[in-house]
């Protein structure tokens, strides 16, 4: 028999293919439409990893752990932070971009997410295509600070000191391309200061280098230095906001110091790899909104140093 004979093909198809009427197609379409929501009801079915592209004790790490704890409490499932530091956050962002888009790997991104493509020759992610945004979760101003042995009490005194001794001083940041790094570079250019940048893999180790006295000057976000300033291990000279920060009112602003053009902040945002099911994105959005709107959440974040 010639199995390719069109008459045989038509006859076999009629014998073995069930008749599907309009009701069958509507039922099938309805079942398919329920699949994403049913799948989301079981999400997450294993621990969820939140990648932070910087070392522990920096703002992204602090926010990531705060958020992970509350997501775990609300869902009864495990959300954990994994620090993947280096290259101004590029290592972590690249790893998150390549992760399976199933909702079990997320990214706690910061301002470097949009800055780095303009600073580096190449980055391991496409900021427009590789991620699906879930929610903005926080924002924090920066702080200019020094080791207590540096005999200055204000940002103006610090810039005068650096100008008087060109090339002598270095300053630290959480990494090249961070907003704090760019803020200091802007200050250097506007005042003609000669000062060397020492980048670290995160605010935590950068701050510790100043606490130890290894480096004299630093600039990073408020959450990374807040308690160290309160404890007298660092001296804060100015916060880069228009008004004094509610939980650190003793720190003057850059506006008060005469540097109004130095206002800046770093944001944190939760993201998922592109292609993550829409039902999972919606679920996470609802959970994050509920967490941020919960009684006492705003006060907790302000105390940590976030807006």
Map each language-model feature to its residues.
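Short coil/turn segments
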Residues: 55-57, 111-112, 139, 147-152, ...
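Hinge/capping helix and adjacent helix->loop/strand transition within the periplasmic-binding protein
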Residues: 98-103, 118-205, 254, 267-300
